[in-house]
Regions:
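Alpha-helical transmembrane signal-anchor/signal-peptide segments
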Residues: 1-2
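Long extracytoplasmic/lumenal interhelical loops at the membrane interface
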Residues: 9-79
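Short, flexible micro-motifs
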Residues: 39-41, 83-86, 128-129
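Membrane-interface micro-motifs in multi-pass membrane enzymes
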Residues: 68-71, 75-83, 120-128
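Hydrophobic transmembrane alpha-helices and their immediate junctions
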Residues: 74-112, 140
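Transmembrane alpha-helices of multi-pass inner-membrane enzymes
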Residues: 90, 106-115, 120-144
Length: 144
């Protein structure tokens, strides 16, 4: 199954090629390092696994080697199975009846944009701030 992920190129443009490459690095990395490679070490996993991944454009192998192009790939690679905690917190936030819809409408697009589409790391673009506010709201609303 993992070999199919590594070898199967899909027709795409350069931007989506980079995005898919980052997800492939994350999937290969989590199978080899289930506890992750450590904070801000995506580049190490990228360097180790990039030659196992087929891409459409040679330039793809050189792009977004530090930030993974999206925070989901970066989180999975760097934190491994501990990234499931992120998924748990996100689902808890989404389905909580104690958190006002206004907070969800404000926070979720910002979090999902950086998580799935384009994110330049945890400390850029407000990702960590949005995430901290989300966690605060989860626990603050549950204590009332």
């Amino acid at each position: 199954q993992l070999d199919k992920i590594k070898e199967k190129p899909v027709k795409k443009n350069l931007s989506s090629d980079v995005w898919i490459k980052s997800l492939k690095v994350a999937l290969i990395s989590i199978t080899n390092y289930p506890f992750g490679v450590g904070l801000n070490n995506f580049e190490i996993a990228h360097e180790k696994f990039i030659n196992e991944i087929s891409v459409n454009y040679p330039m793809t192998q050189k792009l977004n080697i530090q930030d993974a192009s999206n925070n989901l790939s970066k989180i999975i690679t760097e934190f491994g199975i501990f990234s499931l905690m992120l998924a748990y917190l996100l689902l808890r936030f989404i389905f909580s009846k104690n958190i006002d819809l206004g907070y969800k409408i404000f926070l979720l697009p910002n979090i999902f944009t950086q998580l799935l589409f384009r994110g330049a790391g945890y400390f850029n673009g407000g990702f960590i701030i949005f995430f901290i506010v989300m966690i605060y709201l989860i626990f603050e609303k549950n204590n009332k």
